[in-house]
Amino acid sequence: SFYTGYPRFKFKDEELIPKGKIISVPQLVTPFMFLERYSLWPYRKLRDQFSFLSHQHLDVTVSKNIVEPIILISFCAAGLHSFRKNKKLGGINICDKGSTHIEYQNEIMKEEYLRYGMYPREIYQRRIDKELREYHEADFITVPSKFVYDSFIKKGISKEKLKLIQYGARI
């Protein structure tokens, strides 16, 4: 099955995944995306908390529906509970991370804010904590570039756990 926080209509033209396999869990992601799209967040902290909760909601929903061992691929910050359930059943867990190691990312952002004399906006701590646990509990972490790969190595993640899968295609 393919679980998503996006509403079902976003997949109306999807041809590669059978319609019956797409399970939409939009209760928190849809309002989050609406507020994000139109910059309607009154406070950054509220945005960060809502984002964390939307990932958490999807994660818990998926975990409740795992009944046998599977190969589970989850975007980072949305798989910890599912990983734990799947691991108990003997499954394989893959954390898909499209950007650098969360601590590395936070450090670079902080440096850049300070470089330009701005107040640093750090990543929401609960997200950092959850991602770090996911890195530890995942069997593999997929990353899209050598730069991202190297950020994980610098933060102590083993080469054996990392899988470099570059985005794009050669046509």
Located regions from the model:
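Short beta-strand scaffold positions
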Residues: 73-77, 143-144, 164
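Acceptor-binding helix/loop patch of EC 2.4 sugar-transfer enzymes
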Residues: 32-49, 92-129
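Carbohydrate-associated surface elements
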Residues: 147, 168
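A conserved catalytic-core segment of Leloir-type glycosyltransferases
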Residues: 4-57
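Membrane-proximal helix-turn-helix segments that form the acceptor-binding/catalytic region
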Residues: 59-69, 80-82, 88-89, 101, ...
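An aromatic- and histidine-rich active-site surface loop
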Residues: 8-12, 54-63, 71-109
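Short acidic capping loops at alpha-helix termini that bridge into adjacent secondary structure
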Residues: 159-162
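Generic beta-sheet signal
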Residues: 2-5, 96, 144, 165
